[in-house]
Amino acid sequence: MLFTLISRLAMYRSQFSLAESFTDNVIRGTVDEPARGGIVWCELAGGYVTHSGIYTGNNRIVHLSGDGEVLCSDRKGFMARLNGLNPAMSVYTDCQGRLPVGNIAAAGRALRALGSRRQYHLLKENCHRFTAECLTGRPDNAVVLHRQLKRLQRGNTWRVWED
């Protein structure tokens, strides 16, 4: 019974995510490319969790993977979390109105971290904390969730990065 309830909740959440994604992609508008050093993120597990990183230009995102390696990926690679079982449809980026905003210093910090390894921990040393560290230049123990990362957002909204 519990499994059935969880399955139904996941199904409803997935349907909501589809509607939300349609709204974000078609009605609200999109951006052609994030700003260099901008925060980017996508949903995981039907929108229950998110994955974040820093856009470094040329269709590349630097992010902390689940095995603790700092990787540089294109958009598809960035969304391909959870061994390909992630149904993410969109990558979001930080915007002020319709214009993407970034942080050149964050892009540099992200690129310098490329190839390094960390002791990944879902709640203590994750992608959001890595992203926050790139943005601020220092470890930020207060950021482990996506909603905490939002306080470092330079813009006032999130927009979908158009394909």
Predicted regions and their residues:
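Cysteine-nucleophile amide-bond enzymes
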Residues: 1-163
